[in-house]
Structures are given as structure tokens and as C-alpha cells.
Amino acid sequence: MKIFLDTADVYLIGQYYGTGLIDGVTTNPTLIKKSGQDPEEVYRQIALLGVDDISMEIVTDDSYEFLKEGRRLKEKFGEITTIKVPCTPEGLKACKLLSKEGIRVNVTLIFSAAQAVLASKAGACLLYTSPSPRD
């Protein structure tokens, strides 16, 4: 099992990552932008803390945009890059394409075991399960 901190608060990441109990970080570019920051600058700051797995979300609904942006982020940030895509038909298609190129993928918005199986079959290395809306 791996534990990922779901935040872009660099100070908080530094505190928790330093415990040795956190395996990586997941981020949300929409929330980063709302805070007035640039997502790629935040990724750079997180990387400087020594975090070796950052899930970088791409906001699109087109598998080829996921692929294009995923390649660009992998080129820029290297081995710390994991691309975060939703468990949608386009997200799963992108997962398959990215993973075939050796780019790690974290599939999010998983609400059922069936979705987890689909994401695994598409090549996801991480699955982010969401709480059931009924919980």
C-alpha cells in the first residue's frame, strides 16, 4: 500500500514528506490556480523537497490532449511524473496510451471495483478511489 498526500501546499508537504510515511503527492491544477499560483512552479517546488512521485492532473476530456500534455510534463519533470486522469472513457484511453509509453498513470474518480479493474487493465499504476456519494 502507498499513501499519497492530496495537496499542493508546499509547506504541508515538506512537513509530512519528511516523516518518511508519505510515498508521493497528488495535486489539482484548478485549485492551485485558484490560489494564485502556477501549477508547474508548484510541481517544481514539490520536487525540490525530494518528493519522487507527483501526480500531475491534466484538465481535459480528450485522450490525445492527455497524451500530448502527459508527454510534455514527463519531458519537463522526468521520473517524478505520474499523470492523473479521470476514470472516464477518454481518461482510460489516455491511460492505455501513456502507460504504453512508460509514463506512470494515476486514475482518479474510481467509485467501484469494476472501475478499478478497468483502470488496472488500461495500465494504471495507481488508483485513487473516491468515497461513495452514499457514504
Residue ranges and their predicted role:
Residues 128-135:
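Conserved small/polar residues in nucleotide/adenosyl-binding loops
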Residues 1-11:
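N- or domain-start disorder-to-order transition segments that initiate the globular core
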